[in-house]
Structures are given as structure tokens and as C-alpha cells.
């Protein structure tokens, strides 16, 4: 018996239009970033997109994410192509090269077939509006040269700064880019409050407690919408995973004029399945993550407190899985596991074999029904406020 050949991503893209990333013109847009290298969750994302008729960036990773996972933009786009084919996705989907900072980043994203380019000028913004504006111009022009006649969309990321982006600055930047003839599709400001990884939005910390007040966020969002309205620009929200308290506000204020980016907590959903069904493996991952945390947290804004961690060694699998649920109140554990994803996924034994990755995928495959159910429910929590009534 001859085994059928598994088609390569490039072969699929050459043959089937639905497996190629495309420009997304309809809104809202959902960024379904997926960090793990084994596609299982990416396929579920594609199925959810098909079922609920979503506009998705099925391929979405930042430069930081691909560096930490040892992948490339091409790997991410190829995973999305294979996932779209496996899920029989017929809706258009996009590929987002996220947080691009250098010409090399842009070239890699263009070569991989990305259709959406997120330019991170947070560093330049700290030097002044002129520096940020100049950097955007250079990046957009390079992308235009490399893409040729192929269409693409653009996004300006201002979110990785210490202070809320002034609405006056947003207006001045958009006016400048319009005068320069630069096609700006989206803008991602630094909003009031905190969009920390793996946990819900909060406004500030008082006496060691997170204050979950959304009034200031909503007021800023209303003002931002007024600023961008005349420019035809979409508003993008970064680090949008598990920010459940603000989804209804985004839907109410922006209607469909929003691009919500999510990524990291799909990895936590996988750890939830592993905790439930292979507690020894989960504990090993936890111990490794704890050892890596101080190093891996360096590029993230976090408020995790190691003194608030549960006794993982004393809890059984179902109890640990319960602690990994979104909004369960154990934010400290979730943040520590969240930001160490790259170290866990790329860890190697002395002989060069994966320390965790192969065992992780084996558990997920053995418990595919449970994994699929949890992932679908998690995705639905993110998209439900934006679905038609």
C-alpha cells in the first residue's frame, strides 16, 4: 500500500486560494496568534472562524514571539495554511507580521507572505513625534517596494510605552501620514490602564490590589474614535487575550471598527489539558517555568507576585486545571506560566531531544476531544460580545 503524500504548504497555496493569506477588508478583525509549533490549536481556530464567519489573522506572531519559540514568519504562515486546509476554511484569512522594527523584520514578513504589517515605533515615539513619523514612513515605503502590486494593510503600534498615548499625538501623527500619502489602516495606542499578559484589564494597583475600573478606558476609547473617524483608520487592541471586562465596551463603542489581537492564553489552555491528564508533566513544566521566570519576564509588563503562588506539588490534576481557568483569580500562576512559553517549547535534553514539547503534544492528541472543547469555549469567550445578536 502506498501512503498518500502530505501536501506542502507552498503546494497548497499554489492550488487552493483559501489556503493563501489575504487582505482583510471586513471588520471586526480577530488576531488568533498561536505560539505552539504543532498546529492543533491553529486548526481549531480555523474551524471556529468558519463556524462563526469571522475575519481572522490566522497567522499572527510578533518578532519577540518567533524569537522565543525558534520559529520564523514562514513557519507561522505555513502553519496557518495547513490549518486552513485541514479545517476546510473558506473565509479569507490574513497573516500579521507583528511588532516589526527593522528592515530585516519587514523583509522576512514579506517573504513569508504576510498581508498585514504592524510597525512598532514605541521606541521612536519616546524620542518625539517626528522620529516616530519618520520611522513609519521608511517602513511603509520599504514594504510597498517589496510587495510590489500585491495588496497589504498597515498598522502603527504605539502601545509599548510607559504612558497613555495622548489623543492630540494620535491626531498629529495621522495628519502627518495623510500629508505624506502613507496608507495607514490601523493604529494601536497605549490605552489607560494595564493590559498585562494572561489576565483581565485593570486600571491601577492600590494597596496591592488591582482596581478593575473600566470607566477611564471607555472615555478614552470614545475620544479616540472621534480622532480616527475622519481618517478611516481602524483601532487595534494589543495583548487582548482574556481582557473580558472590556470586550463589551469595545463592541459598544467601536461596533465593528476594531482589531483585537490575542495569542498567549491559547498556550495556557494547552497547559490546562496537560495538568488535567498528566499532572507529573505539568509539575515539571511548572518547576522549569518558575526557574526561567525572572529571565523571561524582562520584556513584559507584569505584576505577578511569586509569594502568591499555590502549592502546585500538593494539588492534583483537576485542581491545577481549575486554577488555570481564565478569571479563576489565580493570576500570578497564569502570568508565570504564560511568559515562559518560549523556554518551555524550545527546551532540550542533553542529547538534543525536546525536553517537553513531544510529551505535550502527545497528551493533547490523546485527549483531543477535551482539548478541542476547552479551546472552542475559550475562543468563544473572546468573540461572543462581537457576534451579531
Regions found by a protein language model. Give the residues of each.
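Active-site capping/gating regions of soluble enzymes
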Residues: 1-79, 85-87, 103-128, 132, ...
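Aromatic/His-enriched, Gly/Pro-containing loop or helix-boundary segments
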Residues: 80-82, 89-91, 95-100
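Hydrophobic "anchor" residues on beta-strands that sit immediately upstream
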Residues: 94, 155, 234
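Short glycine-rich or small-residue beta-strand-to-loop segments that form or flank ligand, phosphate
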Residues: 153-160
Amino acid at each position: 500500500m502506498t501512503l498518500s503524500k502530505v501536501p506542502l504548504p507552498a503546494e497548497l497555496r499554489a492550488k487552493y486560494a483559501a489556503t493563501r493569506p489575504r487582505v482583510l477588508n471586513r471588520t471586526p478583525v480577530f488576531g488568533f496568534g498561536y505560539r505552539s509549533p504543532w498546529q492543533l490549536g491553529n486548526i481549531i481556530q480555523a474551524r471556529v472562524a468558519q463556524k462563526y464567519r469571522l475575519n481572522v489573522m490566522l497567522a499572527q506572531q510578533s518578532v519577540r514571539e518567533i524569537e522565543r519559540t525558534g520559529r520564523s514568519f514562514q513557519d507561522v504562515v505555513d502553519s496557518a495554511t495547513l490549518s486552513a486546509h485541514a479545517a476546510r476554511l473558506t473565509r479569507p484569512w490574513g497573516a500579521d507580521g507583528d511588532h516589526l522594527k527593522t528592515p530585516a523584520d519587514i523583509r522576512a514578513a514579506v517573504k513569508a507572505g504576510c498581508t498585514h504589517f504592524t510597525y512598532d515605533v514605541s521606541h521612536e515615539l519616546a524620542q518625539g513625534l517626528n522620529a516616530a513619523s519618520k520611522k513609519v514612513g521608511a517602513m511603509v515605503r520599504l514594504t510597498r517596494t517589496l510587495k510590489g502590486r500585491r495588496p497589504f494593510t498597515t498598522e502603527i503600534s504605539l502601545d509599548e510605552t510607559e504612558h497613555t498615548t495622548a489623543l492630540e499625538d494620535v491626531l498629529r501623527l495621522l495628519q502627518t501620514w495623510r500629508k505624506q500619502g502613507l496608507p495607514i489602516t490601523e493604529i494601536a495606542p497605549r490605552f489607560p490602564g494595564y493590559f498585562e499578559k494572561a489576565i483581565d484589564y485593570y486600571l491601577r494597583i492600590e494597596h496591592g490590589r488591582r482596581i478593575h475600573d473600566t470607566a477611564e478606558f471607555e472615555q478614552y476609547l470614545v475620544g479616540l474614535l472621534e480622532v480616527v473617524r475622519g481618517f478611516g483608520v481602524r483601532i487595534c487592541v494589543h495583548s487582548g487575550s482574556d481582557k473580558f471586562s472590556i470586550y463589551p465596551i469595545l463592541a459598544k463603542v467601536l461596533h465593528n471598527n476594531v482589531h483585537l489581537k490575542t495569542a498567549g492564553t491559547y498556550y495556557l489552555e494547552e497547559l490546562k489539558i496537560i495538568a488535567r491528564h498528566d499532572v507529573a508533566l505539568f509539575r515539571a513544566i511548572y518547576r522549569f517555568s518558575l526557574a526561567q521566570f525572572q529571565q523571561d519576564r524582562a520584556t513584559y509588563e507584569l505584576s505577578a507576585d511569586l509569594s502568591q503562588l499555590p502549592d502546585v506539588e500538593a494539588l492534583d490534576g483537576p485542581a491545577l486545571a481549575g486554577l488555570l481557568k481564565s478569571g479563576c483569580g489565580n493570576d500570578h500562576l497564569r502570568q508565570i506560566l504564560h511568559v515562559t512559553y518560549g523556554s518551555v517549547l524550545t527546551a532540550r535534553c542533553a542529547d538534543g531531544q525536546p525536553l517537553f514539547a513531544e510529551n505535550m503534544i502527545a497528551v493533547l492528541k490523546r485527549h483531543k476531544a477535551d482539548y478541542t472543547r476547552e479551546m472552542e469555549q475559550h475562543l468563544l469567550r473572546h468573540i461572543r460580545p462581537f457576534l451579531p445578536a
